Amino acid sequence: MTEALGTETPGMRNFTINFGPQHPAAHGVLRLVLELDGEVVERVDPHIGLLHRGTEKLIEQKTYLQAIPYFDRLDYVAPMNQEHAFCLAAEKLLGIAVPRRGQLIRVLYCEIGRILSHLLNVTTQALDVGALTPPLWGFEEREKLMMFYERASGSRMHAAYFRIGGVHQDLPPKLIDDIDAWCDPFLQVVADLDALLTDSRIFKQRNVDIGVVSLKQAWEWGFSGVMVRGSGAAWDLRKAQPYECYAEMDFDIPIGKNGDCYDRYLIRMEEMRQSARIMKQCIAKLRAADGQGPVAVEDNKIFPPRRAEMKRSMEALIHHFKLYTEGFRVPAGEVYAAVEAPKGEFGVFLVSDGSNKPYKCKIRAPGFAHLQAMDFICRGHLLADVSAILGSLDIVFGEVDR
């Protein structure tokens, strides 16, 4: 018996406990089976699949337009970033370019998504190690951002706002003004959170030198996003492979040097400031003369005609009906498109057979690679550190289980 458990001492055996699926620090439906030697973690076995809904298979039975809402339900704390990857993949296959105003709105809302995700993560990471105030402050700001989502798309979470070829509808000027007015006070909230956590003795004791990942290990495990930047690589798809109009934006990529939980926290804090900076640049460009114009391609075979036009023109009505019943055909081929989602590199590998439905849509979720490494990162740490490490990985189960 003792040999099977890998322990040497006769009569002694490791203690196995379940962490989750209803553990308050488990971030959704995570189940970890922990093997403990006293209080030291010997092995971590993550059990996934408790939120599996067969998303990739369902997408194969839907038209390209009907597939978009499935992406909101993957990483549901930053929904539009996922829609973005799918739309980019379909646009590559179709060979269409999004108008400039549509690109600016997409970038603006992707940065709102990044702040939504990082606010949730930083404040719940603080909650996991015992700080109760940050979530109250962070969620107040998230509430305002959810309102911006709602005013653009009609929904607070599952927006389904992006379309292949652009976005669903233009933003009213008042909404753009309100987002602009939100940016500067938000920086003060980040400063307040910073003052509360960054130099806090208890917060540092719980995070410094916990969950250290070297850069070589980060690449070997397939990490991306904050997880590799925390280990010292200035790798960000917005700079490395700029998509939409990120090449025009002026922003910095924060990187860590220790690769521990504390560095990852600091990077997320700085990324929120950089996102607010990008948002302000987007708003300035949306207000400029060259930022005016359509928000989506004006090809009625791909994007529906305007309501007013449908009331006048029979052709427009036919286009609309065909688009929402049959959809459009995408040229045969395969393509990989990736965006820098808040959690890391979110990729979509899309295979088209020339019909109106995707032949295959493989989703590359960043959280999946990070969760795989839980065993490797947690070994040798104490039981109490497991929730701190889990918090700094930023895992959402919608995208892990798909």
UniProtKB/Swiss-Prot annotation:
Its EC number is 7.1.1.-. It catalyses: a quinone + NADH + 5 H(+)(in) = a quinol + NAD(+) + 4 H(+)(out). Keywords: Cell inner membrane, Cell membrane, Membrane, NAD, Quinone, Translocase, Transport, Ubiquinone. PROSITE patterns: COMPLEX1_49K. One of its GO terms (molecular function) is NAD binding. It is an enzyme of class 7 (translocase). Gene3D superfamilies: Cytochrome-c3 Hydrogenase, chain B. Its main location: membrane. It is a peripheral membrane protein. One of its GO terms (cellular component) is plasma membrane. It comes from the Bacteria. The keyword Amino-acid biosynthesis does not apply. It is found in: Cell inner membrane. HAMAP family: NDH1_NuoD. NDH-1 shuttles electrons from NADH, via FMN and iron-sulfur (Fe-S) centers, to quinones in the respiratory chain. The immediate electron acceptor for the enzyme in this species is believed to be ubiquinone. Couples the redox reaction to proton translocation (for every two electrons transferred, four hydrogen ions are translocated across the cytoplasmic membrane), and thus conserves the redox energy in a proton gradient. Belongs to the complex I 49 kDa subunit family. NDH-1 is composed of 14 different subunits. Subunits NuoB, C, D, E, F, and G constitute the peripheral sector of the complex. NCBIfam families: NuoD, PRK06075.1. This is NADH-quinone oxidoreductase subunit D 2.
